[in-house]
């Protein structure tokens, strides 16, 4: 009996991942959420951070931006703005984005700028964290 479920990760630009997996761990606004075969149907908000995917007994990690996840009948669909494998992350670009976001947070002019800067900082830090694990 198979202990896998089907996972799809989609962005506006591409089908990032698809296939049978044993487990995933995603970041939500309330903490990490693990999914195994047979998980109850649910819809969840995905927060900026990493996704850990267990496939064929091995763990893989990628960075996801914000989005949504639907779990139903051993099929998980994740819709996010961006998704990147560690080898797709430009570390210098992520460091520059982090510095820009930190500077904007220091001189924020509006609530909207603050929210945008916090999101940009979270994306840059997630990229650097995952990239740092796989250098």
From Swiss-Prot:
It is a peripheral membrane protein. InterPro entries: ATP_F1_dsu/esu_C_sf, ATP_synth_F1_dsu/esu, ATP_synth_F1_dsu/esu_N, ATP_synth_F1_esu_C, ATPsynth_dsu/esu_N. Its main location: membrane. CDD domains: F1-ATPase_delta (cd12152). The keyword DNA-binding does not apply. GO terms for molecular function: ATP binding; proton-transporting ATP synthase activity, rotational mechanism. Produces ATP from ADP in the presence of a proton gradient across the membrane. Gene3D superfamilies: ATP synthase delta/epsilon subunit, C-terminal domain, F0F1 ATP synthase delta/epsilon subunit, N-terminal. This is ATP synthase epsilon chain. HAMAP family: ATP_synth_epsil_bac (MF_00530). The lineage of its organism: Bacteria, Bacillati, Bacillota, Clostridia, Eubacteriales. F-type ATPases have 2 components, CF(1) - the catalytic core - and CF(0) - the membrane proton channel. CF(1) has five subunits: alpha(3), beta(3), gamma(1), delta(1), epsilon(1). CF(0) has three main subunits: a, b and c. NCBIfam families: ATP_synt_epsi (TIGR01216), PRK13446.1 (NF009980). It comes from Acetivibrio thermocellus (strain ATCC 27405 / DSM 1237 / JCM 9322 / NBRC 103400 / NCIMB 10682 / NRRL B-4536 / VPI 7372). One of its GO terms (cellular component) is plasma membrane. It is found in: Cell membrane. Keywords: ATP synthesis, Cell membrane, CF(1), Hydrogen ion transport, Ion transport, Membrane, Transport. PANTHER family: ATP SYNTHASE DELTA/EPSILON CHAIN (PTHR13822), ATP SYNTHASE EPSILON CHAIN, CHLOROPLASTIC (PTHR13822:SF10). Belongs to the ATPase epsilon chain family.
């Amino acid at each position: 009996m198979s202990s896998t479920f089907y996972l799809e990760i989609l962005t506006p630009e591409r089908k990032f991942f698809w296939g049978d997996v044993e487990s995933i761990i995603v970041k939500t606004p309330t903490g990490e959420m693990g999914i195994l075969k047979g998980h109850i149907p649910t819809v969840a908000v995905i927060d900026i951070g990493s996704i850990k995917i267990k496939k064929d007994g091995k763990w893989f990690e990628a960075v996801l931006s914000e989005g949504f996840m639907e779990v139903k009948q051993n099929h998980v669909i994740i819709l996010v703005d961006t998704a990147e494998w560690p080898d797709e992350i430009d570390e210098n670009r992520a460091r520059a984005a982090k510095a820009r976001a930190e500077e904007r947070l220091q001189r924020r002019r509006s609530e909207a700028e603050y929210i945008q800067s916090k999101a940009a900082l979270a994306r840059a830090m997630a990229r650097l964290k995952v990239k740092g694990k796989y250098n």
